[in-house]
């Protein structure tokens, strides 16, 4: 559309903004709202208004776990989601839309929530995604043959290869060491005033999106594995 418009994209990420931050790889994101940074409405609206004046449009990405300065989620509905007491989230983009429209910056604001799309879009994965997830499963399967391998999970540790490039290794540890723990997006990689992420962050992300797996299609539609409850 050629009319003035703000587009707000919501990604998964309750307590960490890795997914939201990775969208900056496209080079199209104007403003980024992460859980790691206390949300300040006045600063955010000021930046949206500035972008609209400069270019007539504004592309905002927000993590579902974005919080006010007092720790309250933008989108929490007050109900527990699971046994760990996590609040049910979803709707951060809608909240931002309401704030932007109510501030009179634009008459129209479009929202897109990626939660289910991100979970099911196997055609959008990178070759690195595919190979690492397969190898991770194999690693867990081989370890499970040992009786002592119980109550544990297998994870991926990032490192460097002999050539200094991207490399990973798999490791096992007790599930209790990881359950309900969060690895936040590094604060030193976050630019001020919602302006995105640093070049160091982009360098970290780039190896993860390399390669395009060959899709298996039937009648033009990517073939997917049916959920167990629908077989």
Task: Give the location of each predicted region.
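Accessory alpha-helical/coil subdomains and C-terminal extensions
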Residues: 1-110
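C-terminal non-catalytic interaction/assembly regions of soluble proteins
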Residues: 77-231
């Amino acid at each position: 559309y050629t009319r003035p418009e703000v587009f707000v994209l919501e990604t998964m990420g309750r307590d960490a903004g890795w997914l939201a931050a990775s969208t900056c790889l496209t080079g199209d994101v104007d403003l980024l709202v992460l859980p790691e940074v206390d949300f300040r409405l006045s600063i955010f609206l000021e930046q949206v208004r500035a972008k609209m004046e400069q270019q007539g449009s504004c592309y905002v990405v927000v993590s579902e776990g974005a919080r006010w300065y007092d720790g309250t989620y933008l989108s929490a509905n007050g109900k527990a989601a699971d046994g760990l007491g996590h609040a049910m989230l979803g709707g951060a983009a809608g909240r931002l839309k309401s704030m932007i429209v109510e501030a009179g910056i634009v008459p129209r604001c479009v929202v897109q929530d990626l939660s289910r799309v991100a979970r099911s879009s196997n055609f959008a994965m990178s070759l690195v995604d595919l190979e690492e997830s397969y190898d991770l499963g194999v690693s867990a399967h081989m370890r499970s043959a040992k009786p002592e391998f119980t109550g544990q999970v297998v994870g991926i540790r990032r490192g460097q290869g002999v050539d200094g490039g991207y490399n990973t290794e798999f490791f096992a540890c007790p599930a209790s060491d990881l359950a309900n723990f969060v690895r936040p997006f590094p604060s030193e990689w976050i630019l001020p005033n919602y302006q995105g992420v640093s070049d160091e962050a982009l360098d970290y992300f780039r190896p993860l999106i390399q390669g395009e797996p060959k899709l298996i299609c039937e009648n033009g539609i990517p073939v997917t594995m049916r959920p167990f409850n629908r077989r």
